Amino acid sequence: MNIEQKQKELDLTYYWDAPIYNFYVSYFGDETIIEYEDDRKKYWRVTFLLCGKVEYTTDALWKNWRDYNVKSLKKTQLGYSAQNFTLLQYVQNKNFVECRIDLGGLDITIVCRDIQIEHLELKDAQFFWQDNETVE
């Protein structure tokens, strides 16, 4: 993977301050996905593939910060936003990239072999917080 090119592709999503829709780890850590807002019709999905390491720290440990489960929140209550995605050559294995990600109250480090970026239709999406939204 060309790290500089992938960083440019990420930057072209204009992620700065974009609300985060979801973050999840699947397949025993092999895939990690971050989904964030683009506009009212589309969103971005960034999938980290063949992950060798996934570490993250949440805001649950912050003193007097939150005492509720994130899964019970509505979209407008989430409060996570994309601040920075930094891609670096992984020092211990040149076939991997180290991804340092700041999502406000969530700091993530992922070591993976590939990154897929998708621009998807919001109308087709399923997010955990949609179950908490009220129908008006």
Please tell me what each predicted stretch does.
Residues M1-E136:
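Surface-exposed, interaction-prone regions used to assemble/regulate multi-protein complexes
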